[in-house]
Regions:
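Phosphate/anion-contacting hairpin/loop surfaces
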Residues: 1-65, 73
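Small-molecule kinase domains that catalyze NTP-dependent phosphoryl transfer to phosphate-bearing small molecules
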Residues: 252, 260, 277-279, 299-347
Length: 349
């Protein structure tokens, strides 16, 4: 189908585009958001039939400027917030046009021209860097299949807790970090404690018995020593993880949903790439060298060789990359506390 400059906007797919920010009727826009129940506002803004001209980069910038959390449900956006979205969309797009657009990786607005707007971006592409307003590490998550960056403090959803996830390999010092945060006003949710609780439940015992034989249960209790031996087989470890992890994640989510705390720390060894990763506002990765791990395992009465072998698959590199804070826990507790105290934004003052 051929079109001319007068009617090209009347034919699909261009005819399906929503108004650009300059032409946006706020009341109509707000009503459109009201119909999008349970859909995150970031995902709604990516829909070009609702508002066109933004895209992933400028959606992050607009939400950062308006202090709206990208995970907030679109139907909960107020008329005042809808007005702010329009205002900031216009301002940011004008600034982008003035600066020639954003040059991200291999994208160029036209041959031989590089946009300078990327130098003005405050959110997009800046995951785990300090927020320009409050200093808290910006968080990168995925919404609608698109990378999304926001500030957990400046874009906090009223009535929702700040969730800090602590992760790291075995005997790295995770518990010391989460216990410190607990002493500073956080509610602590410990995945290992939840596993111990689950191991007391009949259904879980029956499941373990089915997976690993009757030897998995001794005198009515889960035989952890036996499990440690069978888990040296990678296939058996995968079986246990597939069985127990969904139960742990569900229990943690239930505790979070039932909590009235303003700040929650979840201590989860296998946090990375789990369903819990996306709900965390900050990830703290705790690392320790093998010498330190062995010393701590011996102190706990554990066999270092077996324990380290079972946990050899921990994704250290990926966890470190995704963390907003990396803690070196090779030293004593006083050194650890000083390191944590250097992050003022962690403390609920």
């Amino acid at each position: 189908m051929l079109s001319n400059e007068k009617d090209y906007l009347l034919n699909p797919p261009l005819s399906l585009l929503g108004p650009e920010p300059w032409d946006l009727d706020v009341n109509t826009f707000h009503k459109g958001l009201q119909r999008r129940k349970s859909e995150p506002i970031k995902e709604a803004l990516l829909d070009q039939t609702l508002i066109s001209g933004l895209g992933n980069i400028y959606d992050d910038e607009v939400l950062f400027a308006t202090k709206i959390n990208p995970k907030m449900e679109a139907n909960l956006i107020s008329l005042k917030q809808a007005e702010a979205i329009k205002k900031e969309s216009i301002r940011i797009l004008r600034e982008a046009i003035k600066n020639g657009g954003s040059t991200i990786r291999s994208y160029h607005p036209k041959e031989g021209v590089s946009g300078m707007m990327q130098n003005e971006l405050l959110a997009y592409g800046k995951g785990n860097t300090p927020c320009s307003r409050c200093g808290f590490p910006l968080r990168k998550i995925s919404i609608g299949g698109r990378g999304t960056v926001y500030c957990p403090i400046c874009q906090h959803i009223e009535g929702k807790p700040l969730i800090v996830g602590v992760t790291g390999p075995i005997a790295s010092g995770k518990s010391s970090v989460s216990t410190y945060l607990e002493s500073n006003g956080y509610q602590k949710i410990d995945a290992d404690a939840i596993v111990s609780s689950l191991y007391m439940e009949s259904d879980v015992k029956n499941g373990l018995s089915s997976l690993f034989g009757e030897e998995a249960i001794k005198d009515g209790n889960v035989d952890r020593d036996y499990l440690s031996k069978v888990l040296l087989d990678g296939a058996n470890k995968e079986k246990l993880d597939s069985f127990i992890h969904p139960l742990v994640y569900k229990r943690i989510e239930e505790e979070i949903n039932n909590s009235k705390a303003k700040r929650i720390v979840i201590d989860v060894p296998l946090l990375i790439d789990s369903p819990l990763e996306e709900i965390c506002d900050l990830i703290i990765y705790v690392e320790a060298n093998e010498k330190t791990q062995i010393a701590r395992l011996v102190e706990r009465g554990k066999d270092p060789k077996t324990s380290l072998a079972i946990n050899s698959g921990f994704p250290r590199g990926k966890a470190k990359k995704k963390a907003g804070i990396v803690i070196d826990a090779n030293y004593d507790i006083n050194h650890l506390k000083k390191e944590l105290e250097s992050y003022d934004f962690l403390l609920d003052k």
